Amino acid sequence: MHNISLPPGQFDGPHVAGLFTNTLDYSFHPWLERLRPLRVSAHFFVRRDGQIVQFVSADKRAWHAGISTFRGRDKCNDFSLGIEMEGTDVLPYTDAQYAALAQLVPALWSRYPLSAVRGHEHIAPVRKTDPGPAFDWRRFGEVCGLPARVLPRI
């Protein structure tokens, strides 16, 4: 689980999709220029209104985790699915986003052997802070019907 908004704190625009499809208009906002060297992607993006956008097949690798480690294994992109939430670390996520996750995550769970769900903050704690304190892990687990053992300790 990650969060993203481009430019930071702005929602509903085309910029996240542009970043994940390498079509971002860097001239739109000066802040976006710093993203030019990045080549990133995610499997899924959940907008504030609950719309789910898929960028990469869940059967393929996406470039969402960066330098990361989980349970002693490096390169989390090689063995994980990336869900990006439109948001920030501190702005509460929307009811529509949790409802979307309640549809998406069980569908993924039924098809893939998911052993854990973690945030960027858990797999790259020195570099990343998302999805941040605004993400309600208990609520997420409840709406998705996930056993506590797959969630981070809260």
Give the location of each predicted region.
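N-terminal catalytic cores of peptidoglycan-degrading enzymes
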Residues: M1-D74
